[in-house]
Amino acid sequence: MIKKFKITYPCFTGPEKRRLYVYLPRGYNIHKTKHYPVLYMFDGQNVFFDDNATYGKSWGLGKYLNQTKTPLIVAAYECNCHADNGRLSEYSPFYYNPQGEWGGPYEPRAEETMTWFINVLKPFIDSRFRTLPDRGHTFISGSSMGGLMTLYALLKHNDVFSRGAALSPTLDIDIDQLCQMIQAAELTPDTVLYMDYGRREFDYESWSRNNFVRSAQLLGSKDILLSTRLVPEGEHNEASWEKQLPFAIPTLMYNI
């Protein structure tokens, strides 16, 4: 079951409302006393429905969770879909100046985004659904810029999020700043991170291999449960990320 809401994000949208998709696991309305972990996701329009997806293809996450009977609530919030590429600011921890068509530079507003997720979105979900609201059952995930935000959330807000899945995280950033953030992060040993990158992404983004390896090595030096993958034939799109769900979701649900 997927419920849809429209809620405001005042610091970015003013009175404009964005869509929030909430997946409730199979049996939610039968087992009335059972509570569930929650996975918060970026780019919510791309998570469940092809009709809503930015490029016409979603992750198909609801179908996967139904088929696997995964006992997990998912709260997926829509990103800034406007032509001004405001998403790149909302999802960036650092000043971001991408190459080519994306313009820039973009002001970093990742902390504002996470403050809203923690202080507004999480209480909204916890007050309406049977969640397990503690840190140990609060997860976060995304791809591309949402993958970068997943890393940021675990590194800077490890007191709220215990587990994350970062698929093809955007790494054409100031990699030195990200590495410094990783080194400075105080992560508890029960932190779980899944991070992957597509083999084909390395072919057309010359910086990506070194940045992925460098960040993965630093993350590996932390006392956490880390799973990194190089995806054969993997690309930077939803069709490819959908195929990684059998790896990412079981990692998030490890020993739950």
Language-model features and meaning:
Residues 1-256:
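Non-catalytic cap/lid and distal C-terminal segments of serine-dependent acyl enzymes
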